[in-house]
């Protein structure tokens, strides 16, 4: 169960929160909770930002367009080498290290995103194979 917390907002902040929540189809308290959680995560991991996408809200490297799960999956694909992953992704090793630091704290979340991506890839492969089979028959 969540803890109750009362907060006074500066003039205009509540109105902007209300408008943003309405546009996002969320309750104000849900959006405020998300902002607090993501703000705390960003304070601890300043090279990580949070963005919306087809699979929902996710952690990504600031100004890079790479999700944390993509960096972690690439490290795994390179036998755990952060240097090789950085070279493959064409990003500084420091950004790979930032993704690894975030992963260390939110491993279950990132592993779940990797699993979802792998499942989606397999569905796509199966659909492509079925399409190729249909073309041959």
PLM ranges: what are they?
Residues 26-27, 87-98:
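Short, basic interhelical loop/turn and adjoining N-cap
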Residues 40-44, 97-112:
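Short, solvent-exposed alpha-helical "recognition" segments
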Residues 1, 42-66:
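Short, Lys/Arg-enriched anionic-surface-contact patches
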Residues 1-9:
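Short Lys/Arg-rich basic patches
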Residues 20, 84-87:
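Short alpha-helical "recognition helix" segments of helix-turn-helix
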Residues 7, 17, 24-37:
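Short amphipathic alpha-helical segments
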Residues 54-62, 114-137:
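Intrinsically disordered, low-complexity basic tails/linkers immediately adjacent to helix-turn-helix/homeobox/MYB/SANT
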Residues 64-79:
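Short, amphipathic alpha-helical "recognition" segments used to contact nucleic acids or chromatin
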């Amino acid at each position: 169960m969540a803890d109750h917390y009362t907060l006074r907002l500066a003039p205009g902040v509540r109105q902007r929160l209300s408008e943003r929540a309405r546009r996002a189809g969320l309750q104000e308290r849900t959006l405020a909770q998300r902002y607090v959680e993501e703000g705390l995560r960003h304070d601890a991991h300043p090279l990580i930002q949070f963005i919306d996408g087809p699979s929902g809200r996710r952690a990504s490297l600031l100004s890079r367009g790479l999700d944390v799960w993509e960096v972690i999956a690439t490290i795994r694909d390179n036998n755990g080498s952060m240097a090789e992953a950085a070279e493959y992704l064409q990003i500084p090793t420091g950004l790979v290290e930032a993704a690894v630091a975030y992963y260390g704290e939110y491993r279950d979340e990132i592993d779940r995103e990797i699993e979802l991506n792998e499942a989606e890839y397999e569905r796509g492969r199966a659909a492509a194979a079925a399409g190729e089979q249909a073309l041959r028959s």
